[in-house]
């Protein structure tokens, strides 16, 4: 009996008589959804800009400015040394800041992807004490293949760093303080991935291949 009832129910549910007809398209509903999404996007953008504005001085200034420290427009990048998208965007970004002395470039070490990311960031921050941050940063960003601890220190030697001193400096409390500060800044502006850029006070995220840095700088100048 139960089997018969179940079979009957299945037939009824499958019956075209009982199947709900497709809802007619309603342009008013579609417009309401689009308006809502547009308003939400605008509000999210406004909220992000307000969060950035409240932290802008801290974001734009620090020990890891690698180009044009007196520039009038600042690009801040949150990055990870093992992030392929960060590495892919680096040549375009460096060409821009090296060709326009008005653009300051401030790096924010944000090691979120691998153990090697954290080692690399600690080493890079420690290299500041030997005046080699820019050279070491670029060497790590341009290093090919999988980044590991041996490769990090190989790059350090290649740019003239005293590796024994570097290892000691990596353990200093101020290195941890800087990384924690970067994570707090990222959390404060709702950055949870790499790369993320702030150009002239506006947060720019998305596929780094689609970001036109020159265009973003031009917008910031207006």
Enumerate the predicted regions with their spans.
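Structural alpha/beta surface segment adjacent to cysteine/selenocysteine redox centers
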Residues: 76, 81-82, 87-157, 187-192, ...
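Short low-complexity stretches enriched in small and charged residues
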Residues: 28-35, 59-64, 120-124, 150-156, ...
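Bacterial N-terminal signal peptides
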Residues: 7-16
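Generic alpha-helix initiation/capping and coil-helix boundary signal
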Residues: 1, 7-8, 116, 120, ...
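C-terminal cap of thioredoxin/glutaredoxin-like
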Residues: 2-4, 20-31, 154-222
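Short, flexible turn/loop "capping" segments at secondary-structure junctions
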Residues: 68-69, 116, 196
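Extracytoplasmic thiol/disulfide redox context detector
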Residues: 16-112, 171, 177-187, 222
